[in-house]
């Protein structure tokens, strides 16, 4: 029985021993397996792969071999084509792909076949970036080893022949020592551009086929070339392979480059050097241009090329004279920014579908003979639109005229934006025969001449349609409630509304301008306190800041009223002299002649019924002509015009101006013909008199018009809102005076593309719906938009019509365009937004920014743009060499002054893979700092917010608040919470007040406080702190963190290696102990078994008590 018990005990102990041993063995195997897998995966990561060519005649040809895991192998030719060869050649520094070879053309390799079914797009940077079956996976033998033939370009040449100079002619290419031609199949201007650029012959003017420059001989090297125009050499375009074609030499292609074309442009048969029929010199002969599609964009390019930068009109068959000879160009289509007419799209040279009765012409201007004005509206910012071109004056026809066009006029005249546009009623008997027709402005142009499709001249217009405008800067004054027309309460018209002016907002200089504008002479007195009675309605809340020399009140600067509100009891009034615009005419000198007055804009002779020497003496003094010598009768200086003023002056002779004399007109008798006042003054040779303004106005031009005003329109008609930049956001349209949204029904990339194009934001990356950028307000203007993508404006697309929809604002449409840009700093801590790798969002993707040329000024721009601080540091680059990320831009160099990174020069946008060592890593200064302290952990508390540094008010400031600041700055604990500007008074905003921290907050702005910037404190109450420690710089803290991480990683590897070694040693030791048992008896067996079981139990117990994984022995 005891023996049986011992056997059972023995078996039980053996089972426990085996279970414990198996547990340890499995763990050891798993660790080793994981480490091995990591090593294998790392070896396939890309850094240890190499590419070479073997068996070829030179370094740029041979069998393709790839080195993976320190072992060279070949590539199978399945799917092997020119796109793949392009990648191989470029990767090896032999940029031109010549031929794709297979079937062991360069002899069969040996060893591994690493890749099969390789498929490239052609733009990959390495062969292993292309798709393939997987490393070592294939279904071929070495008899299918792939090869390539590349070229570094040294053995390739190109030229143009048979054209008379090196920049035009038949294209010929030298390859393998033989010259050959290019087939014209699919040959276009893109191919010609590559050829001209490669030969340094300027831009491509034209291309030709059908052996236009004669048939060549020898090989035909290329056929069906596909170029995008950006390639550096013709052989870098996609093609089927050298020498592969289905042509003969009757299809040889040729090109004409700008430097070889001898192209010139001129105008003939015009009235000026900047107008007439257009003619182009091509291949030594002058010819004309057909007017098919001829518009203002084409004319703009032609005028600019001729040195007459403003296109007045594009002339077609109606006005241009007929030329002779060739018609060189037809269907010209320019964008308007081209520098030469032949850079625009057009048919091939000499191909046309018209006769000389359709010859195109232009009327251009150098700008000196163009004038725009508003007339008859009470100020220079309102009235009928008049245009003067080359001394010819005309009106603007109201046909197709709207608020967009009016807005351009107002802006061009410095009159703000358009408040309204209307038509002016005139009788047909006073009609003008000269008209300006404007068919399309977008509202953003700087001048009317920049609008599209405007024509000048002889087309008819209904004479009830003269365009009239009122601009926002229009201010028309009047005097109301006075005894005479030139005195009274000042009232000013803004748009259609009249209002009074507060006496504190109107100076003597402003009164002087008002009197001059009203043709009322000079100011006599300025009266406040509603001297001429209280007005009603609007009181304008603006101060007139005139200097006194302005001709109109609307030309004076205005500013918001500085003293708050005003009532009608303070309406200002003015008394003007009225009669100071007076002159002598028809005399032999400026100091003698017939007396004429200007009253309310009209000049007329003064009746002599009450004219005497006292009046004459004041006038001579006023005109600086000495004293009056005589007042001859009988109209010795002529009778003058029909207008004779009957006003009677009652001067005493002591007044300085005629306006100071008493004047009466009431009841004055009629003046008979010839009864006009005259005077001869003594003269004063030391002074001269400038002639008075002799202009007259036609009373009929002041006829009141019947106006159909409409709501103001802003300068923009389309915008993107709440997207973080001008090229992303909710789409909003301005229509009928209101901004509104677009419904997302049927909204797609074609629609979004039109929006992006219209806003000059590139192309559409995403067409968002469901109010992705938040719900808008106001009208929903458009629904079910269906664009084809070619429209220039979103409202040109098909839709239900303005305001017709079945949506709500939760369906507001939005877009993200390719030119939308954003900025961020990426760190391992997702909550850290002011330190990390610098990335920009562009063209729909995030990419890093290179560290080349990165300066503190650039870092400061980044930190300010992100709202982090006004400065920062360039952090050490990441040491991780296994990661490659896309980089967008490098060599950013910000000068002082830019607000955003987008304003700084850099290298061009170019997306490429970059290692972390090439990227920019930035640490912005903390949003909180201590100033004027004895250490960097004491001082006045300042916070970065809203783009500037500001202070914290000491109301409620205590040790808990200081504790948060010290912890946030890494300065230990707070020793003191300073008050009353303990470290001096700061400047700028006081950002926070009534801060009430508990003491455990992460940052000061996590504490309760008043709203940002709302404070009733002065800087004498600036808060401060004194902390217990001197803080390490943020950079050193990051360095310490990285060093700790590296040290911890090394320690972990060493510990793991020791553990594995210990486990292996333990297993071997137990095996030796088990062998010794067989010779040691039962007691030894039992002791070993119990010791093993006890060890397993203690290890398990230790694991449970030690969650950190510390496997130290428990005593």
Swiss-Prot record:
Key word Cell membrane present: yes
Q: What is known of its domains?
A: The SRCR domain 3 mediates calcium-sensitive interaction with hemoglobin/haptoglobin complexes.
Q: What GO cellular component term, any one, is given?
A: extracellular region
Q: Which domain of life is it from?
A: Eukaryota
The record lists its disulfide bonds as 76-140, 89-150, 120-130, 183-247, 196-257, 227-237, 290-354, 303-364, 334-344, 397-461, 410-471, 441-451, 502-566, 515-576, 546-556, 607-671, 620-681, 651-661, 743-807, 756-817, 787-797, 863-924, 894-904, 953-1017, 966-1027, 997-1007
By its UniProt entry, which SMART domains does this protein fall under? Answer: SR (SM00202)
Q: What SUPFAM superfamilies does the record point to?
A: SRCR-like
Q: Which UniProt keywords apply?
A: Acute phase, Cell membrane, Disulfide bond, Glycoprotein, Host cell receptor for virus entry, Host-virus interaction, Inflammatory response, Membrane, Phosphoprotein, Receptor, Repeat, Secreted, Signal, Transmembrane, Transmembrane helix
Which segments constitute the SRCR domain? Answer: 51-151, 158-258, 265-365, 372-472, 477-577, 582-682, 718-818, 823-925, 928-1028
Q: Which residues are the signal sequence here?
A: 1-46
This protein's assembly is summarised as: Interacts with CSNK2B.
Identify the InterPro entries for this entry. SRCR (IPR001190), SRCR-like_dom_sf (IPR036772)
Q: Where is this motif: Internalization signal?
A: 1090-1093
Membrane topology term reads: Single-pass type I membrane protein
Modification after translation:
A soluble form (sCD163) is produced by proteolytic shedding which can be induced by lipopolysaccharide, phorbol ester and Fc region of immunoglobulin gamma. This cleavage is dependent on protein kinase C and tyrosine kinases and can be blocked by protease inhibitors. The shedding is inhibited by the tissue inhibitor of metalloproteinase TIMP3, and thus probably induced by membrane-bound metalloproteinases ADAMs. Phosphorylated.
Ranked from the top, the taxonomy reads: Eukaryota, Metazoa, Chordata, Craniata, Vertebrata
Q: List all topological domains (Extracellular).
A: 47-1044
Tell me, using the record's free text, what induces this protein.
Suppressed when monocytes are differentiated towards dendritic cells by CSF1 and IL4.
**Which BP terms in the Gene Ontology apply to this protein?**
acute-phase response
Which species is this record about?
A: Sus scrofa (Pig)
Q: Which GO terms describe its molecular function?
A: virus receptor activity
Q: Which residues cross the membrane?
A: 1045-1065
Carbohydrate attachment sites?
105, 139, 936
Topological domains, Cytoplasmic = 1066-1115
- Which compartments does it reside in? Cell membrane
Q: What is this protein called?
A: Scavenger receptor cysteine-rich type 1 protein M130
Q: Classify the main location.
A: membrane
């Amino acid at each position: 029985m005891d023996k049986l018990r011992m056997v059972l005990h023995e078996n039980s102990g053996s089972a426990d021993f085996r279970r414990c041993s198996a547990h340890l063995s499995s763990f050891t195997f798993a660790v080793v397996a994981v480490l091995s897998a990591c090593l294998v995966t790392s070896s396939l990561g890309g850094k240890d792969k190499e590419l070479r060519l073997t068996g070829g005649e030179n370094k740029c040809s041979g069998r393709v071999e790839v080195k993976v895991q320190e072992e060279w192998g070949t590539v199978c030719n399945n799917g092997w084509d020119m796109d793949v060869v392009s990648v191989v050649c470029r990767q090896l520094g032999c940029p031109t792909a010549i031929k794709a070879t297979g079937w062991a053309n360069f002899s069969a390799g040996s060893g591994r076949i690493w890749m099969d079914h390789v498929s490239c797009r052609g733009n990959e940077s390495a062969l292993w970036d292309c798709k393939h079956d997987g490393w070592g996976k294939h279904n071929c033998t070495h008899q299918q080893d792939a090869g390539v033939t590349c070229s570094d370009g040294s053995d390739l040449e190109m030229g143009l022949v048979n054209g008379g100079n090196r920049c035009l002619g038949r294209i010929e290419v030298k390859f393998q020592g033989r010259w050959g031609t290019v087939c014209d199949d699919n040959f276009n201007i893109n191919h010609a551009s590559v050829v001209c650029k490669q030969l340094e012959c300027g831009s491509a003017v034209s291309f030709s086929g059908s052996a236009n420059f004669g048939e060549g001989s020898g090989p035909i090297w290329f056929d069906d070339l596909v170029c995008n125009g950006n390639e550096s050499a013709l052989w870098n375009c996609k093609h089927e392979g050298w020498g592969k074609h289905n042509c003969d030499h009757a299809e040889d292609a040729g090109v004409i480059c700008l430097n070889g074309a001898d192209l010139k442009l001129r105008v003939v048969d015009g009235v000026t050097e900047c107008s007439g029929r257009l003619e182009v010199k091509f291949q030594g002969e002058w010819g004309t241009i057909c007017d098919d599609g001829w518009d203002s964009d084409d004319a703009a390019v032609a005028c600019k090329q001729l040195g007459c930068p403003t296109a007045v009109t594009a002339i077609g068959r109606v006005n241009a004279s007929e030329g002779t000879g060739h018609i060189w160009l037809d269907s010209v289509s320019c964008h308007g920014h081209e520098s030469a007419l032949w850079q625009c799209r057009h048919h091939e040279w000499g191909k046309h579908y018209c006769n000389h009765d359709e010859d195109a012409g232009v009327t251009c201007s150098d700008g000196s003979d163009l004038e725009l004005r508003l007339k008859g509206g009470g100020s220079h910012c309102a009235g009928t639109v008049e245009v003067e071109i080359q001394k010819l004056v005309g009106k603007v026809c109201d046909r197709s005229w709207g608020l967009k066009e009016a807005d351009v006029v107002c802006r061009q005249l410095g009159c703000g934006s358009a408040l309204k546009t209307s038509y002016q009623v005139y009788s047909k008997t006073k009609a003008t025969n000269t008209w300006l027709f404007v068919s399309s402005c977008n509202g953003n142009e700087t001048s009317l001449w920049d609008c599209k499709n405007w024509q000048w001249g002889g087309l008819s217009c209904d004479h009830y349609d003269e365009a009239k405008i009122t601009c926002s800067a229009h201010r028309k004054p009047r005097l109301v409630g006075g005894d005479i027309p030139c005195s009274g309460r000042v009232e000013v018209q803004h748009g259609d509304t009249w209002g009074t002016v507060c006496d504190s907002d109107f100076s003597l200089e402003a009164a002087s301008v008002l009197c001059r504008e009203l043709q009322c002479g000079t100011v006599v007195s300025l009266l406040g306190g509603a001297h001429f009675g209280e007005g009603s309605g609007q009181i304008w809340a603006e101060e007139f800041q005139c200097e006194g020399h302005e001709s109109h009140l609307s030309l004076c600067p205005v500013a918001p009223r500085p003293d708050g509100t005003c009532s009608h009891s303070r309406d200002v009034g003015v008394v003007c002299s009225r009669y100071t615009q007076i002159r002598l005419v028809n005399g032999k000198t400026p100091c003698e002649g017939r007396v004429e007055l200007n009253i309310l804009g009209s000049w007329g002779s003064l009746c002599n019924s009450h004219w005497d020497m006292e009046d004459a003496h004041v006038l001579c003094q006023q005109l600086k002509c000495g004293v009056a010598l005589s007042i001859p009768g009988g109209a010795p200086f002529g009778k003058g015009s029909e207008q004779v003023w009957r006003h009677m002056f009652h001067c005493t002779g002591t007044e300085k101006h005629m306006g100071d004399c008493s004047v009466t007109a009431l009841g004055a008798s009629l003046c008979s013909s010839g009864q006009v006042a005259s005077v001869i003054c003594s003269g004063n040779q030391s002074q001269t008199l400038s002639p008075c303004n002799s202009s007259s106005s036609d009373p009929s031009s002041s006829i009141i018009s019947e106006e159909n005003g409409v709501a103001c329109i802003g300068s923009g008609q389309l915008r993107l809102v709440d997207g973080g930049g001008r090229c992303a956001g909710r789409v909003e349209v301005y229509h009928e005076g209101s901004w509104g949204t677009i419904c997302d029904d049927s909204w797609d990339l074609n629609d979004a593309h039109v929006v992006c194009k219209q806003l000059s934001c590139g192309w559409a990356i995403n067409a968002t719906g469901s109010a992705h950028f938040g719900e808008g307000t106001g009208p929903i203007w458009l629904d079910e938009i269906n664009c084809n993508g070619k429209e220039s404006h979103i409202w040109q697309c098909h839709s239900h019509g303005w305001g017709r929809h079945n949506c709500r604002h939760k369906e507001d449409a939005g877009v993200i365009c390719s030119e939308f840009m954003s900025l961020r700093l990426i760190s391992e801590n997702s909550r850290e937004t002011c330190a990390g790798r610098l990335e920009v969002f562009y063209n729909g993707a995030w990419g890093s920014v290179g560290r080349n040329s990165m300066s503190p000024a650039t870092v400061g721009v980044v930190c300010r743009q992100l709202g982090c601080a006004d400065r920062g540091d360039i952090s050490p680059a990441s040491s991780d060499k296994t990661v490659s990320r896309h980089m967008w831009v490098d060599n950013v160099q910000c000068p002082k002054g830019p607000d955003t990174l987008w304003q700084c020069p850099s290298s061009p946008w170019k997306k490429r893979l970059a290692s972390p060592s090439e990227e920019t890593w930035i640490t912005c200064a903390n949003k909180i700092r201590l100033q004027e302290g004895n250490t960097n952990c004491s001082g006045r508390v300042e916070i970065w917010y809203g783009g500037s540094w500001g202070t914290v008010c000491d109301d409620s400031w205590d040790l808990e608040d200081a504790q948060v600041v010290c912890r946030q700055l890494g300065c230990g604990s707070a020793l003191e919470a300073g008050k009353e500007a303990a470290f001096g008074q700061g400047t700028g905003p006081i950002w926070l007040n009534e801060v009430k921290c508990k003491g455990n907050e992460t940052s000061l702005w996590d504490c309760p406080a008043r709203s940002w910037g709302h404070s009733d404190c002065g800087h004498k109450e600036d808060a401060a702190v004194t902390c217990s420690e001197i803080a390490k710089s943020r950079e050193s803290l990051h360095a310490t963190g990285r060093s700790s991480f590296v040290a911890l990683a090394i320690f972990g590897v060493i510990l793991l290696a020791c553990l594995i070694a210990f486990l292996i040693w333990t297993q071997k030791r137990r095996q030796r102990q088990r062998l010794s048992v067989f010779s040691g008896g039962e007691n030894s067996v039992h002791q070993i078994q119990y010791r093993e079981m006890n060890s397993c139990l203690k290890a398990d117990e230790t694991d449970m008590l030690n969650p950190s994984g510390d496997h130290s022995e428990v005593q």
